[in-house]
Amino acid sequence: MSSQPLTLQDMMAAILRFWSEQGCIIHQGYDLEVGAGTFNPATFLQALGPEPFKTAYIEPSRRPQDGRYGQHPNRLQKYHQLQVILKPVPENFLSLYLESLKVIGLNLVDHDIRFVHDDWENPTIGAWGLGWEVWLNGMEITQLTYFQAVGSKPLEAISGEITYGVERIAMYLQKKNSVYDVMWNDSLTYGDITQHAEQAWSQYNFETANTSMWLKHFEDFAAEALATLDKGLPLPAYDFVIKASHAFNMLDSRGVISVTERTRYITKIRQLARAVADKYVIWRESLGFPLLKTIPSTPTVTAKQIPHICQDEDFLLEIGSEELPAAFVPTGIQQLESLAKKLLADHNISYNNLEVLGTPRRLALRIQGLSHLTIRPEAEKKGPPLSLLFEEDGSVSSQGEQFFASHGLSISHRSALDQSSTICRVRSIKGTDYLFLVIPEERIETAAILVNELPLLIRSMRFPKKMTWDNGGVEYARPIRWLVALYGDQVLPISLGFVSSGNISWGHRQLDNRQLTIPSSKEYIDILRDACVIVSQKERRSIIEQGLQNLTGDQTVAIAPEHLIEETVFLTEHPFVICAQFNPDFCSLPKELLIAEMINHQRYFPTQNLQGEITNRFLIVCDNSPTDTIIEGNEKALAPRLTDGNFLFKQDLLTSLDSFVEKLKSVTYFDALGSLADKTARLKLHLEETYPLLPLCPKEDIDTAVHYCKADLVSAVVNEFPELQGIMGRYYLQNAALSKAAAIAVGEHLQHITLGSSVSTTGALLSILDRVDNLLSCFILGLLPTSSHDPYALRRQSLELLTLLYTTQSSVDIEDLFSRLVRHFPTTIPNTVWSPEDVLNKLCSFVWGRLKTILSSLGFAKEVIAAVLTENCPKNPLTIINSARSIQELQNTQTLETIASTHNRLKKILASLSFSVTEQIFSLITSEDMLFKQALERFKEATTSLPISSREYLLQLEDLSQSTALFLDSVRIADDDENIRNQRIALLVATQKCFGFYAWDAL
């Protein structure tokens, strides 16, 4: 970095000058309030259609919700994005970006630069793409994106977008802790020019903006966009889409749109953007796509001869790409391994060992001792019946001529088959003669198979999202830039789109960014290591785990969730673990808030002491040799995040909980079901109905918890960190000196519940009430999940409801529970037709279907689950689980064998008889009848207080089964005497009921 850092305006000018030299048009920012540079027509509209375009411009961007009254070091409601669009994307896209950093004084060797997975999406305008956040020593400074769709339209030509966060970059270059201290030019700071405006606009955005006016603006702008489109004017129409989007952002900042209502607004804007995109492409096509005259030519790929491999050798395939998302690398490793093994097995190719290695820039398949030949054994292919191939006189039929010609055979008569036994054979199948073609044994070179199959294998790999980057027709997780395919020391010529294989790989992007010649597969790992790439993921994990352990000592431990360790393994090619610190004053913030900032946002490992208290030391896994610059940069990256968290938390503590509750009235839950205040009122009704059934905790505690459980939804912290909903509510209740049990319950009621979760009784009851209300709400509104889509997590919530009822040992029939609580919903709902009966039937079936998952998780055998989950079983989760436990305890014992065999015998006998169901038993005539009746009465008396789910009930049922079997052996049920017959049938009907709802024939 130069000794004299650039001012903000000089820095922006340098970047624009760099891109101008690359052929970009220098545009100006748009003259409307846009939330990001992507909204500028130079991006949104120019990305559509096939026309090439290269531009760079500085976009003033408005995000009302990000305002911090001019007090935050880098959060602004109005800031600048320097946007670059390259269409089509050049192959050296990432390299060009890194070169642009050099022109503003960044020496890349001194910094830890990461390309961190970013599936960028702007749902408001139906735009999405795949790429990265670029982190400079832990601070996000740029977004790089390969656009895949704009205006909900897949793109004909891919655009590459670079979005520089110019304020953040300037802060780093000038070593400023606050954006307001950044020198705009040699005499004025950023604060001199913008800070007062930030204060004024924050006050307007959050406090005084007229929500009625903005609601009307939104509707008016949306209507005008449609009207303008109808007149065939997509450009003016798009301006009104931008205006509608800004109106939505204003309403969002005022907190009058709930999480659920946001979807409706966003959907409306997205539909408008799609309509504009459609009309724009049609309009440009009518003009003949005038910019197509400048489209560049595409590269060509030349086929090469397959080398002859004469002995078994090691094989290497390296798929070199731009940085893969960390979560995609293990997926790629698993797939490449399984697909390669299947390929070799399908072709009967032997080998000694196979492994797949992966880093952000490469997936490498290494096969040791790969056989150079495979033998395809002789095989037969069934053909048509001879009667279709030959006429009666033996001559070849017209169909036969076509068949033989298609297989390159010269057969003129039926008799010729006898001289062609090595090619054709006749076999009789069920009296009909068929022709079989003989495919002789063949020795095939493995190299030829690999050349043909490997491109198909790579194309077949699946990732959560795949992308295109040119018109080569290839989709992959990120652009493929090189292929290494070595069989021994010979290059196998494979091609994928415009990329052809060779023996050239690449070293570490920062530590040793040079081409590497790989002489053979055996030398691959060592050559990569010499170029600072540790290609083995196991070795990188070991380095990270050891580094975390070495830097924590005896009195502290790293908070190191498995997902973060794995992510850092696949974010690095040569990991180093370093320690940094933050201001210890921040340790007074809620632990969960600190962890969310460090782990979720920064991929840092927090540390805590042996008492579980957060310390001010944190650990960083970087991908460059540690320097003071890297440590200082990461500390500076974290400080604004903690400052923001502290600002929001302190702001919330100054607001009373009752003020939060009052504000819930203005936040929509579901448009058709009113506000969050309406939901809270409904939860109170649910509680009054449910508490007699589930008196799990003191009433005053659950009353308090229900009243305040949604209060933190309108807090500043939860608005910024939605994942902390409920957790922050706990802190706010504690701050208000309310019931400790209620505070804990609020903190627990939104956490994911599993069989191993520890939840307080008050928290469990609150969680039950909330989940039942959510389920009923969605089913009433028809928001049912599909096989692939469950946006409201109804499956998970159903599982959690059943789990809570079981873990609290609450004996509740869910049909009864739902039928009681559905009465608390309005019978008439706008734009919704519903009936309680229909909702209850669908909801009970849906929730009950999840119980099988819980039974499986508890380890019950399939036959046990089938025995208890029957059509007529009670809809009581606790009863069913206890029943399964009792059955499983007695499985493979004489008890169950006796019960099952007797029940099945009884069921078969009753099915064979014709009778009217009755339990009335009159005077019994025979001693056998009397004895059996007495056994039945003893059973009923013994089980009066026993639940049918208990082991003791089943043991009593065993005794009754033995008495039943003895009775059936001793008498003839279908006695000639009608009275005796009816009495015995009545006895059996009464006995059958004692076997309960169980499916005994499943055992």
UniProtKB/Swiss-Prot annotation:
GO CC annotation, single: cytosol
EC number: 6.1.1.14
Subcellular location: Cytoplasm
Record-level Gene Ontology MF annotations: arginine-tRNA ligase activity; ATP binding; glycine-tRNA ligase activity; protein dimerization activity
Major enzyme class: ligase
Catalytic activity: tRNA(Gly) + glycine + ATP = glycyl-tRNA(Gly) + AMP + diphosphate
SUPFAM superfamilies membership: Class II aaRS and biotin synthetases (SSF55681)
Key words of the record: Aminoacyl-tRNA synthetase, ATP-binding, Cytoplasm, Ligase, Nucleotide-binding, Protein biosynthesis
Region called Glycine--tRNA ligase beta subunit, residue ranges: 311-1003
Highest taxon above the source species: Bacteria
GO BP field: arginyl-tRNA aminoacylation; glycyl-tRNA aminoacylation
Ranges for region Glycine--tRNA ligase alpha subunit: 1-310
HAMAP family assigned to the protein according to its UniProt record, in alphabetical order: Gly_tRNA_synth_alpha (MF_00254), Gly_tRNA_synth_beta (MF_00255)
Entry similarity comment: Belongs to the class-II aminoacyl-tRNA synthetase family.
Name of this chain's protein: Glycine--tRNA ligase
Source species: Chlamydia muridarum (strain MoPn / Nigg)
Upper classification of the organism: Bacteria, Pseudomonadati, Chlamydiota, Chlamydiia, Chlamydiales
